[in-house]
A protein has these predicted regions:
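Active-site diphosphate/adenylate-binding microenvironment
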Residues: 106-180
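Glycine-rich, anion-gripping cofactor-binding loops and their flanking helix/strand elements
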Residues: 1-81, 157-180
Length: 181
């Protein structure tokens, strides 16, 4: 997907709650759509076409009053390259090859925030996570709105797997943590 974005200039996003995302230093950076619909709309902007790969069209999480449920801009053409019953990786590789997309793509550089001191805030929790996360850690993220800084603070951490909520207030942290152990 990163190769295709490089070749076409497209914006690349992971869905709000990807099942698992391999992240960290030495890996391509794939920005997740933000949980809050107004921020997700800013990320998507005025896109005129959207290609989905093993993901539904972006939608706001709850039916917030006065906010649209669909995050697809009006007039935006939506196409599906591959679904979960297809082989999404093979479909992406075939499209990248068809486009003559470069093999080399930008990778996250190793970087960690300084271990913070002082008041406990969403920013200092994110910085602490980024400073301390070990290689090949499995992070089970149930943060939703308070985790808004986690992605940036951990982007250059050692490679790790990031598991997210199934959506909303449905907690999955304990079962996922037990399964990961």
């Amino acid at each position: 997907a990163v190769r295709i974005a490089q070749a076409t200039g497209a914006k690349l996003f992971a869905e709000v709650f990807p099942r698992v995302q391999r992240r960290g230093a030495g890996l391509p950076v794939v920005e997740r759509l933000t949980y809050l619909s107004e921020f997700a709309q800013m990320q998507i902007g005025d896109a005129t076409s959207m290609v989905l790969v093993d993901a539904p069209a972006p939608a706001s999480f709850f039916a917030y009053p006065g906010k649209p449920s669909s995050l697809v801009p009006e007039g935006c053409a939506v196409s599906t390259l591959a679904t979960g019953t297809d082989d999404p990786v093979a479909a992406l590789e075939a499209l990248a090859d068809h486009l003559g997309a470069p093999e080399d793509v930008p990778l996250a550089e190793a970087s960690r925030p300084e271990l913070p001191t002082g008041e406990l805030t969403v920013e200092t929790v994110a910085a602490s996570l980024g400073a301390l996360i070990p290689e090949n850690a499995i992070i089970v993220d149930e943060a939703q709105t308070s985790g808004i800084f986690n992605q940036g603070a951990t982007a250059g951490a050692p490679p790790h797997d990031w598991l997210t909520l199934t959506g909303g207030a449905i907690g999955i942290g304990v079962p996922l943590a037990l399964g990961a152990a």
